[in-house]
């Protein structure tokens, strides 16, 4: 008799737990949810002095509810800390223990200026999870992402290498490839070119030969191809990348087909396969992004604009479903790219509106501090290009100097310095010009930079030689630029070099060679279209036709020159009247809030007299550390432009939960 009677209290208590949990879930899932009553039901569980495991689980559930449905972060933290203190030493309680650690780390990141507490929590959890492959790998990914966000790339890379080894020991091939590709992404941001190639080759062979599930294989292929495309773009290899980009576009179409299974179906059956880099809808936007980057670098501004508008439309659709932070990252990078397109085409007024739109996205994003911090240097660079193209050289110089001081990205720094060199050239500051060219030359003899940026460097040297009337030296530099540009189909760099070479030949009285240079320059400029090269080229053509006494063609060239000039002057007038023009005075802190006409993307570009053209740097890389997503931009300018910035960092940094960037 004593047996049944002693068991009854325990059975009765279990029934109470179950009833209260059921009620809590009922209130949580009601329409609308009744979170207050849900929390009251969970709190009532503690009155029964439950066993340790029940108490820890209930504290975890309270923390989850408070984080998801309320702003009571302090109470959420208290419950999660209690759950961790109870569960840390309990055996066979991994889900509660490590879920709590993961959530506490997230909460520390949200509420504390430093990530140290989050890292310490995850390091302890990683140490305790070594016998649970799923949680060990999940926590390694989370910790590596925090290190990557803090630009501690070596630490992130080491953690990802540990994850790859753990996955291999567990026979989890799919997960191992995710770790390898995530590590390749980090190494790409570090510009460890040889290591990136080795990892990509290793991962590519495994994808081809050791992934039996066709859907997982295609998904990994998209991740692999995104990194491969970004790798080539970061090196300015626009022509070399074309086959990989085409493959990527075909793969994403396969994944987005109506008959393709849902991500839950593909990744939901095996715990060690429940990891994805990005869901397919976000991958779709990312492929648009790298396509935009490629179009910009290749000098196809119309294509870049078209794909940007499609990508932005897709982002808005996804935001209506769920406003994920990565969508804000993608949007900022796309706006940075489209700004470059507008300036090349002579529509600076729309460019400054889009810079303001990018600022608004940074300020409105939930991860405001990190997003603005990550894109501040790019925004200063873009504003510098805008100020340069509207002849506000003092403002442009200060913007580029701020960019150089804020960024740790070598290519962005080089890009800003090249534009500074052009400003010093235009304003006849020979000492400053020599100093910056010497510094750029010294630094880049020891490092391998993007083909596009190095071509831009030779172009600036050619422009400098031209202004010194050192025409032989100018030809030497410009031929080097043309060799690099032609090798990789860098059309804008080609057109700028050709028009400057034409001017060189015109200056030494060789009208035949001048015509041979300016004709293809104008054809390319029309195809891009680049109004600055068209303005310059039409002036050269007018002089050439006057010299050959061809009055009709001289008249046509003059009419074209007037048309381009008037378009740019009209646009200049709109720029200085725009409230967003005030952004040229932003040099520190948060960017000022300006008001103006709302941004509507499809706008016919207009066109500056005697323009200073932006140079256009190289890359667009999109990276991500394992299961999340991060972001980047290129740029440049001169009395004719050559480079461009917009994501002077690869979209490789745009995909890791929130980390990275590039353009």
UniProtKB/Swiss-Prot annotation:
Pfam families the UniProt entry points to: Cohesin_load (PF10345)
InterPro entries per UniProt: MAU2 (IPR019440), TPR-like_helical_dom_sf (IPR011990)
GO biological process entries: cell division; chromosome segregation; maintenance of mitotic sister chromatid cohesion
Signal peptide residue numbers: none
Main localization (coarse): nucleus
The keyword Transferase is annotated on this UniProt entry: no
Gene Ontology CC terms: chromatin; nucleoplasm; nucleus; SMC loading complex
Keywords of this entry: Cell cycle, Cell division, Chromosome partition, Mitosis, Nucleus, Repeat, TPR repeat
Subcellular localization: Nucleus, Nucleoplasm
Sequence ranges of the TPR repeats: 455-488, 495-528
Origin superkingdom: Eukaryota
Quaternary structure (record): Interacts with Nipped-B to form the cohesin loading complex.
Family: Belongs to the SCC4/mau-2 family.
Described purpose of this protein according to its UniProt entry: Required for association of the cohesin complex with chromatin during interphase. Plays a role in sister chromatid cohesion and normal progression through prometaphase.
Protein name as annotated: MAU2 chromatid cohesion factor homolog
Biological classification of the source: Eukaryota, Metazoa, Ecdysozoa, Arthropoda, Hexapoda
